């Protein structure tokens, strides 16, 4: 009898672990081949800009803005991460407003962030008129991290490497597929 109970408990745990869902982007699970994920985004009015072994770049509308999206697969070709790069606004007020709008929306969906930083380093401060300069010089940290059972979402204001202007970036990391990549990497270490 004990063996039957133990077997049923083990099967229940295995079924529960296998039932964990994937993080979603645009209501599309961050899973499956890069090609299939990109095709699903293209059906959601995104346009493929570039596709390569290390990922795919797309352009489209997200949260009311035209953004660049990068789909990143594991070494096995399974989609594991999606990055969103927003356009650089022309002033600090608009950038801060966009950050707070996304922070509020993400908090509504995923709960309060597990990590939140909104700070400037001396000699810069919020309200001094030099906030964008502080961000360009790496003297500010505006960041939030949300964690759910399905994965992690990072919201950050960072310098856009193409324009050298501060902009908002989002990174969605699927827990299951990132864990699988970590397991594969650990075999090499």
At which residue positions do the language-model features occur?
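Sec-dependent N-terminal signal peptides
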Residues: 4-16
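Generic marker of residues within folded, mature protein domains
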Residues: 7-9, 61, 136
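Non-cytosolic coordination micro-motifs
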Residues: 20-53, 87-189
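A sensor for short, sequence-defined functional sites
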Residues: 41, 58-59
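Hydrophobic beta-strand residues in large extracellular and virion-surface proteins
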Residues: 58, 69-71, 82, 153-157, ...
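Mid-chain, structured segments of secreted extracytoplasmic proteins
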Residues: 60-105
């Amino acid at each position: 009898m004990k063996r039957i109970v133990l077997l049923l408990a083990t099967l229940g745990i295995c079924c529960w672990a296998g039932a964990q869902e994937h993080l979603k982007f645009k209501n599309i699970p961050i899973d499956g081949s890069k090609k299939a994920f990109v095709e699903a985004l293209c059906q959601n009015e995104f346009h493929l800009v570039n596709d390569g072994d290390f990922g795919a770049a797309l352009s489209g509308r997200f949260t009311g803005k035209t953004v660049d999206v990068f789909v990143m697969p594991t070494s096995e070709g399974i989609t594991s991460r999606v990055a969103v790069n927003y356009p650089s606004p022309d002033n600090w007020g608009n950038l801060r407003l966009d950050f707070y709008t996304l922070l509020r929306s993400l908090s509504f969906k995923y709960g309060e962030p597990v990590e939140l930083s909104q700070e400037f380093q001396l000699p810069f401060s919020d309200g001094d008129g030099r906030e964008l300069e502080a961000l360009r010089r790496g003297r500010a940290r505006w960041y939030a991290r949300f964690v759910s059972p399905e994965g992690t979402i990072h919201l950050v204001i960072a310098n856009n490497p193409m324009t050298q202007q501060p902009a908002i970036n989002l990174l969605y990391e699927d827990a299951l597929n990132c864990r699988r990549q970590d397991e594969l990497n650990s075999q090499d270490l």
